Every structure is written in structure tokens, then in C-alpha cells.
Amino acid sequence: MLKSQIAPIPSYESQPVHKPSSSVNFITFNQDGSCIAVGNNKGYSIFTTNPFTKCYDSPPGEAIGIVEMLYSTSLVVVVALGEETGSSPRKLKIINTKRGSTICDLVFPSTILKVKLTRSRMIVLLEEQIYLYDISTMKLLHTIETSPNMAGICAISADQGSTDTSNSADNSGSIGSGPASGSGAGSGSASMTSTDSTPDAQSHSYLAYPSPPKTAMHDSLLVAGINTNGGSHSKQNNIQSVSNAPNRVGDVIIFDTDSLQPLCVIEAHKSALAAISLSSDGRLLATASDKGTIVRVFSVSTGAKLYQFRRGTYPTKVYSVAFSPDNRYVVTTSASGTVHIFRLGEDESLESKHKRKRASRQHETIAEETSATQDLDDEIEDDGDDSDVDDVESLEVVPSKQRKLSQGSSNSYTSMNSGISGMSEDGKEPKIDPIVDHARLSVARMIRRSSQTLGRKAAQKMGDFLPSKFASILEPTRHFASLKIASASKDVKSIAVLDSQVVHDMVPQMFLHSKDAAPASALDTQSMTEMALLHIFVVTSDGYLYVYGLDPERGGDCILLQQHSFDI
């Protein structure tokens, strides 16, 4: 039986309603976030997110370590943990859940770390190889040799095909024509005809994975005419930038799975990567390093760095980064138990007056800044640190319209004390208080908020007298919204996705008040009101789904709307 609970008020005092009866070995969303696949010690299960319902349960069998769906079709890829006799973590099975049949199976030379599916490709990641298959015929198209990647870090963009993705996992999608089998990494011979899963003629699917920590790899790509970190720079500049950082391990290779050729190398971080994600249309790449303090967003076509956000001050393990379907937000989860939401591409009018002035002067003074700060840049880039001082790294020079760092992302709590009736700094628009969850208020949080506010005010005063590179240290771009996962367990891993469709939900009236106008009585706390929210779905390794509401106008603290348990 499925266990579910609507969050009580205040929401963050809720406790998990039931401990799942079976260990969760693997949990993930499908490509559009409409379903959740869970692998456990008895098999695997599939749930829909809205509404939360179990729509498929596999027959009891071997423990499953990986389960991946193709949108909401009946095609499922599973890999066993290999704990039972006859099962192996090197064996991949493609299953038609509607027919209950195995379409084909493939055996690889080493343990399978990750599987990714698009409408046209299947990507199988091993420790030192990546296999690319045509999903309609299961023909091996290409093999990529990589550096050791035990963390299984890779990302793929969903090609823009015309597959019907209804919310029913029982929808066969015309995938599979009956049982078939194969063995060996390149011997898949099953024919999986599909009338509605053929990608559009202009669709593109990109694969992103860590670059080997060798300059020879970059040099070979340059010889082949591949861009490294931007198409606007010359090969000489690219080679110089690589040779100056021979120990870089945070670069990302973008690979075109249609042409089967590398597209570019993006210099994302100096330290090792912890998580990467491609937007569904393949235009943007988000990255986080193992330092866990900085999140960056790049243009895939040019390699230019478009956004840089401060996730936190102290290092932590980042579990996942994900784009919203409309590319307006980036969602990150980490070992701290906090989920951060960063906003992309807000209107220029949301920028503060000082940021606009610096942006307008950037092209005029870039030559002087480069000359004046070259020595400092070299020192900072040589230290290998990706924490606080990493903000001083030079940004790629791109048009201001393309970058558009959002004012709302600068600090969710900056205007909390001003009230909704306060005017913006330029006197044109009223400030809107971000949502505040009073259950999350603590002395440490208030002190941190005050120090950030003072820091931003100091940066605004000094910004006109400092080059933009130095000003970015004092005035980092922070999250637009955040939430604290309501799990009682520690060391819980999590992943999250954000739905870009606005939903009207009933929430406590207390969330409409500013800090100074917080409701004083329990009766006021229980009163409900309707709010237009975006839903954030968070799943945790202890077997729970949390649904939070994000106010797209105010940001701030997200509201816990639902809590469900995978009773498997």
C-alpha cells in the first residue's frame, strides 16, 4: 500500500510517515519528470508523480541496481546488483513492461555504472568506456574511451522527437516487437520497430562527460578543429589556456550523438566534477565541482560561461543539478540537505543600478582589466581551489542580453526587512519580500542573512570603484529560492526536478506575511489561501517523495505541499 501524507503546519516539523520495507538501491526520474523508477532488493517499481501512484511493480526477482525509463513508454532498462547467483552488474536487460517480455540483453566487459536513454540513443557508461547504441535497432554505433569515471558522471540531452509521452507507464509506445536476445557489448541484434519514437529530422542529442585530465586530449581536439571553451577565441588562445592549467580535471567534453563527433571541450572547473546536467534542448550545460560551492551554466554551442552562482560558503557534496523544462531555473541537491534553486535570464530591469553600470562599462574596460589583473588571475587559477576565491575567475565576454544574471538570484533574503511596500533602489518598482518559512528561522540563519545583506550593501557602494572581476567577489550571485528536505535521516542522498507548469495550491496564510507581520496566533497559522506555484519534486535515498511549491515571483523558502513514501 502506498503511504502518503499532506504536510502539517508548520511543514518542516513533519516526520516520515512510514519506513519503506525494502532497501532502495536506485531511484531516478524519467526524462520529463512525470514518473519515478525505483530499484530495490526484490525488483523495481514505477510511480507517477502527479498524482502520486504506483503504476507498475515487477515480479519478485533479483535485486536491481539501475532502472531507466524511456519517457512514459513501456520500455525499461534494468541492471542487476549481481548479488544473486546468475545475475551480474555487467548485464543489461531491455524489458517491455506491458508485455512482460525481455526485448534483448547485453553483456559488457565491466560493471555498468549508468544508463541514459533518449528517443534515438541508448548510452551505457562503464568506468573507462561509453557505448552508444541506436535504440531502434540496438546496433552499436560508437565506443568512447574515457579516463576512469567511477562516479558515473555523464549527462545527455533529450532529442526533440515526437514520441507520445502520456503519463501512463503502461503505454507501450509501439516499442518492441517481441522477445529477442543478444550478448556482448556490440552484439545487440534485436529489432525494435517504432512508429512514434522516430526523432524529428532536426533533433539533436548531446552527451556530456568529464574530459581526461591530460592536455594531450585538448591538443588532439584542437588539431581536429574542435573548440575549447568558446567558438570566438582563436586556437592559439585555446592552446595557451590549456597549457597554463595542465592539472585541470574539471573539464567537460560535449559529444554529438547524431554525428558521433565531439563538439567542444568546456573548461568548467579546476577541481574534479561532482555533477553535470544538460538542458532538454541541449543548449545549456550546468556543472558543479567536488568543492560544492559554485554552480556554473555554459552555452553548449559556444562554450561561453553564461552564469555563475554561489551555492554555499562551505564545501559539500553536490548530488545533482537539473534544468527546468523551460530553462529558467537550475535546481541542485547536496549533502547539506538543502535544495537550491537558481533563476536564469531574468529581465534587465531586475538588475540593480550598480550592476547595470558595470555591465555597460565592461566592454570599454575589458582590456585594462585584463592587463591589470593578469598576474592575480594566474595566481588564483594556479591554486586549484574552487571555493570562495573562485568567483574572481574571468567571465567569458558575451553580450549582456545573453548573460542576464538575475537580481532575484543575488540573495533570497536581502529584502526581507524592507517590506513589500518598499521601493526598489532605482525608485521604479516595489520590492517584493521573498517567502519565509518561519519554522526554518534560527539564530545562525538570521546572522548569516544579516552578514550577506551587509556584504551586498558594501559591494554596491564599492562596485563603481572596482573592476567587475573584483566586484564579483564581494557581490556573489546567490540562489533565488531554497528548501530544507524534511527527512529525519542523516546522510540521505537526493535528486530533484522542477516542473515549469504553474499550479494553484492551497497553502497556509502565514507564507504571505513578511517577517515583521508574521501571524501571532495558531488560528492565523491554520488559515489557508490560494497561491500560484511551481512544483519541485524531490526524491531521497531513504524512499520518500517530497513535493514543494516555489513562488516564481517571490522566491525565498519553498513550501512543503505533499510527502509520500515508497512502500515497496
UniProtKB/Swiss-Prot annotation:
SMART domains: WD40. Residues 188-198 have a biased composition (Low complexity). Residues 162-171, 405-421 have a biased composition (Polar residues). It is found in: Preautophagosomal structure membrane; Vacuole membrane; Endosome membrane. It is a peripheral membrane protein. The N-terminus might form a beta-propeller domain involved in specific binding to phosphatidylinositol 3,5-bisphosphate (PIP2), leading to the association of the protein to the membrane. The L/FRRG motif is essential for the cytoplasm to vacuole transport (Cvt) pathway, for the recruitment of ATG8 and ATG16 to the PAS in nutrient-rich medium, and for its recruitment to and dissociation from the PAS under starvation conditions. Component of the PI(3,5)P2 regulatory complex. This is Autophagy-related protein 18. It comes from Meyerozyma guilliermondii (strain ATCC 6260 / CBS 566 / DSM 6381 / JCM 1539 / NBRC 10279 / NRRL Y-324) (Yeast).
